[in-house]
């Protein structure tokens, strides 16, 4: 009887254990801008669907993500912690001390740990990098807001940029993945 109870308890514990996620590496501390919490991270390249030309995960060094969630003071009607949809998020990465740079637009996507904006990217090897994100509000993607007195919310924020500096150690190194 005791063995059955122990097995049952272990089975229940295993069923409530959170799923294992790929190890994310923070690019910098989260910041709050215009009622939004921004937190950029990277992890190993991932496979995504639908697969568009140039999206083969094997050809990249990392998967770049930025989580964009509502702050407790979000004036556009999003609940605290809610993911903000319909953004246009572009990025530019420069290797410090050199000429190398890359840029692109992140795609809205979801994963086991929730929705985010992301893309598989290449780095120019290990080194110190600066990344700049440009965040454009939802009306650029045709997401509207109420403006009447009874149900309206504050106007969308103006497009803005945020930057971080970070060290990329490369694949398979401590601080890499």
Predicted regions span which residues?
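Aromatic sugar-binding surface patches on proteins
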Residues: 111-118
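Short amphipathic, basic-aromatic surface patches that mediate peripheral association
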Residues: 64-82
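Short coil-to-beta strand junction motifs in C2/discoidin
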Residues: 58-61, 78-89
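Short tyrosine-centred short linear motifs in exposed loops/low-complexity segments
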Residues: 115, 125-129
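Bacterial N-terminal signal peptides
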Residues: 7-16
């Amino acid at each position: 009887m005791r063995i059955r109870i122990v097995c049952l308890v272990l089975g229940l514990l295993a069923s409530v254990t959170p799923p294992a996620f790929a190890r994310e590496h923070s690019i910098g501390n989260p910041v709050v801008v215009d009622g939004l919490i921004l937190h950029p991270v990277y992890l190993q390249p991932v496979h995504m669907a639908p697969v568009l030309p140039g999206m083969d995960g094997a050809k990249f060094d990392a998967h770049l993500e930025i989580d964009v969630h509502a702050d407790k003071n979000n004036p556009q009607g999003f609940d605290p912690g809610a993911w903000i949809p319909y953004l246009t998020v572009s990025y530019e990465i420069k290797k410090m001390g050199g000429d190398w740079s890359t840029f692109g637009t992140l795609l809205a996507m979801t994963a086991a740990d929730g929705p985010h904006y992301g893309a598989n990217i290449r780095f120019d090897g290990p080194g110190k990098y600066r990344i700049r994100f440009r965040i454009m509000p939802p009306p650029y993607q045709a997401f509207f807001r109420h403006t009447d007195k009874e149900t309206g919310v504050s106007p969308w924020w103006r497009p803005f940029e945020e930057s971080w500096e970070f060290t990329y150690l490369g694949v398979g190194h401590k601080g890499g993945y």
